[in-house]
Amino acid sequence: MRLTSQVLSDAPTIINPEKQVTLSLRSLKIPYLENLGITKDTYEVIDLTDNELIELSNFPRLKNLKVLLVGNNNITGINDDKLPNNLPHLQSISFIHNNISKFSDVRILCRFKNLSNITFIENPITDSPNYRYFIVWLIPTLKVLDFSKVKQKELVKAKELFGESIDDPSELALSMLEDISTTESRKNQISSKDIRNLQDVGKKLTDEDKAKLLQELETADSVEDIERIERALHNGHM
């Protein structure tokens, strides 16, 4: 389904427990983003969970947007150099259950000045050696990665491995930013989110548990609930 002006007008608006105005665009099979300018920068949260997005791009300038939920899509990276300027106050992104496999495809995240919370759980990129250290180094404003707080010792280790900053990278950092997939993702590139859901979630949960969690995810109306359910799916227990 295309993200038409009519679809946007008909989409439900939710006030979540954090008192944030949320635009719910879940489970609409949206293949790419368009027409978001008609929202007139009304929303603090945009929920695009469970669609068919391949890349994160084509956002207009939305100064009020703080949280972006794009879990359970087919996103392989961010292909929009204007995104950091267009979303200047973005604080949190959930990429859970996508197809991101190359650090070069998320390098632009270092330019988000207020990004403090990000999730890459169930993406091929997490199989890379030193993944957590690298993301912590790449995004110096980060406070929480994959539901775990960033520790001071991680920041120290990250600089030892990759250099003082993205402006002064080590050879290891440069090699990880090359346009190549991680070893694991080259062997096992996953293109279907349905296959990912069956393989990654089904093997950890009973059918009854899985059905219950997915039903809860469909009706969740707050960032807190969404993260709780996604964490349960990732950990394999209720």
Swiss-Prot record:
Positions of the LRR repeats? Answer: 19-40, 42-63, 64-84, 89-110
Signal peptide range: none
Which Pfam families did the record assign? LRR_9 (PF14580)
Q: Give me the segments passing through the membrane.
A: none
Q: Where is the LRRCT domain?
A: 123-161
Q: Which UniProt keywords apply?
A: Leucine-rich repeat, mRNA processing, mRNA splicing, Nucleus, Repeat, Spliceosome
Q: Name one GO biological process term.
A: mRNA splicing, via spliceosome
Q: Which Gene3D superfamilies match?
A: Ribonuclease Inhibitor
Q: How does it assemble?
A: Associated with the spliceosome.
> What family, per the record?
Belongs to the U2 small nuclear ribonucleoprotein A family.
This chain belongs to the protein called: U2 small nuclear ribonucleoprotein A'
